[in-house]
Design a protein with these regions (language model features):
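Short helix-to-coil transition segments within interhelical loops
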Residues: 154, 194-200, 204-224
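Periplasmic/extracellular loop-to-transmembrane helix junction in inner-membrane transport proteins
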Residues: 45-53, 78-121, 261, 265
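A membrane-interface signal for the N-terminal entry of alpha-helical transmembrane segments
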Residues: 118, 269-298
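Transmembrane-helix boundary motif in ABC transporter permease subunits
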Residues: 118-148
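Generic hydrophobic transmembrane alpha-helix motif, especially the helices
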Residues: 149-185, 192-193
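Transmembrane alpha-helical segments of polytopic membrane transport and secretion proteins
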Residues: 1-63, 291-311
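Glycine-rich helix-loop "coupling/hinge" segments at transmembrane-helix boundaries
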Residues: 165-166, 242-276, 281, 306-311
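Transmembrane alpha-helices
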Residues: 176-180, 212-246, 277
Length: 311
């Protein structure tokens, strides 16, 4: 009887060991499969010819710009509007070359870009801890959450008159308008990202001792990164629009001539070509910031999470 029990136990132990061995083997197989897929994707990405990459990424926007220029020139030739309402592409290009020769073109751009980036960094420093606080503290969310949503929907231009009355015509007024426009977007983006973190991650972090600031740094922020990045992109868009509204409305010689002031000067001088120049420069800066800063960050985050789809 004892030998039978011993044999049964041995069989159970053998079966258990075999099962564990099979589980380990399955785990190794799965890890190997994932590594192989990652290597395959990397190899495919690495084998993409430069010519194909340029055609796939550069040709569509170049074609779109060329099409816009052709349609624009056709409208000018058709005289659908007088010259003082619709300038020709060559007239706008003349404005570009004149500003370049006078040495003012880069000054226009840098005046606005430096303000916009500095204001965005200040909004980032305020909106990030505010978003963490709103997302993690129920009372703060109930009290401040609706206000942030309301501020985000409020047009930034509405803040320019009170900012001028409070602070005067200076750079502080510009930064105040940027903060009021961008902070709610950054905070709400982080809140949305934190709300999308699986509760299992948070419980696992608490079990392993990641609480307080450690939990926020190692669990919450990495888990909320996709939503947070979307909030940052929207925050920059609000920063840039807020700055343009402030520069257009609150103009002063002491503030220098930024792109918004250039647009307003064109209106005051009835120079539609200068107005178009300012609009194109504002658009160009927005596209450049997205392509050089936010798009690489977004691709890196998605690639690190296995969510990047290559086409």
């Amino acid at each position: 009887m004892a030998s039978t029990d011993t044999g049964t136990d041995a069989k159970k132990d053998g079966s258990s060991a075999a099962g564990e061995s099979q589980d380990v083997q399955d785990t190794h197989d799965l890890a190997g499969l994932e590594a192989g897929l990652d290597a395959l994707e990397s190899a495919q990405a690495g084998r993409t010819p430069l010519r194909e990459t340029l055609i796939r990424k550069a040709l569509p926007p170049i074609t779109a710009v060329a099409l816009v220029l052709v349609v624009w020139q056709l409208l000018v030739w058709a005289e659908v509007a007088p010259d003082y309402k619709l300038p020709s592409p060559s007239a706008v290009w003349d404005e570009v070359t004149n500003a370049w020769r006078q040495g003012t073109l880069l000054d226009y751009i840098w005046t606005s870009v430096s303000r916009g980036l500095l204001g965005f960094l200040m909004a980032l420093a305020i909106g990030t801890p505010l978003g963490l606080l709103v997302a993690r503290v129920k009372f703060v969310r109930a009290a401040v959450g609706p206000i942030l949503s309301g501020l985000q929907s409020l047009p930034s231009v509405a803040w320019v008159p009170p900012a001028v009355l409070w602070l005067g015509l200076n750079n502080s007024m510009m930064y105040a308008v940027i903060l009021l426009g961008a902070v709610p977007s950054i905070a709400n983006g982080l809140v949305a990202g934190i709300d999308q973190i699986p509760p299992l991650f948070l419980r696992a972090g608490r079990t392993l001792g990641a609480t307080g600031l450690r939990g926020a740094w190692h669990i919450v922020m990495p888990g909320a990164l996709p939503g947070y990045l979307a909030g940052l992109k929207q925050g920059w868009a609000f920063s840039w629009r807020s700055l343009m509204a402030a520069e257009i409305i609150a103009s002063s010689p002491d503030l220098g001539v930024g792109l918004g002031q250039l647009l307003e000067n064109g209106r005051n001088n009835a120079s539609i070509s200068q107005v178009f120049l300012a609009i194109f420069l504002i658009l160009l800066v927005g596209i450049a910031i997205d392509l050089l800063l936010f798009s690489p960050l977004e691709r890196r985050v998605l690639r690190g999470r296995g969510l990047l789809v290559t086409r």
